[in-house]
Amino acid sequence: MMKTKKLMMVALVSSTLALSGCGAMSTAIKKRNLEVKTQMSETIWLEPASERTVFLQIKNTSDKDMSGLQGKIADAVKAKGYQVVTSPDKAYYWIQANVLKADKMDLRESQGWLNRGYEGAAVGAALGAGITGYNSNSAGATLGVGLAAGLVGMAADAMVEDVNYTMITDVQIAERTKATVTTDNVAALRQGTSGAKIQTSTETGNQHKYQTRVVSNANKVNLKFEEAKPVLEDQLAKSIANIL
């Protein structure tokens, strides 16, 4: 009888150790390759034109270094057959972009499996502790084995992290037109904590302007920003150039 209990205990402990790291192992396998996705909030339709000159104004107000981004966008635009010029007055198109944020983000709506992984480790600890019911003669020792099994799962989960970096960029495209374009600008300027000043202005020009937001995601297990940065920049450059 005692031998049977010991065999059952060994089998249960072995199963717990095997299962405790299953969440981490599953994550490591599924997310071993870098996945990059880019989405544009609005489609921009430009009129067909024979003019092929583009002026670029690329800004970065995030806390990450994006010093090479303008060069990548310029290369992508040139690859589409356009000429990048330094004078806005000589350009048929203007491309203005600002990187608002480039950081690790928790996309809870699509990555709920991360929380379930941690729950798996805790369940492993509780299951291991329950072995005491099979061996009342050494409850303390068996409890220690069960908790150790759970801690193995927690340690495995801690070593495997599903990381998603997101880059958010606002983009404005302007194209010249033969028509006269009248633009009314309205701005609400805050005055202290309880007031605001409404400022309006009207200008006349020869450009149609369009705005959109580009969101790029890089996802991989234990991903570092240094690895995510170049692919995020490449995806943004490709997305912007494909508007033309």
Swiss-Prot record:
PROSITE patterns: PROKAR_LIPOPROTEIN (PS51257). It is a lipid-anchor. Keywords: Cell outer membrane, Conjugation, Lipoprotein, Membrane, Palmitate, Plasmid, Signal. Responsible for preventing unproductive conjugation between bacteria carrying like plasmids. This is TraT complement resistance protein. One of its GO terms (cellular component) is cell outer membrane. It is found in: Cell outer membrane. The lineage of its organism: Bacteria, Pseudomonadati, Pseudomonadota, Gammaproteobacteria, Enterobacterales. The keyword Lipoprotein applies. It comes from Escherichia coli (strain K12). Pfam families: TraT.
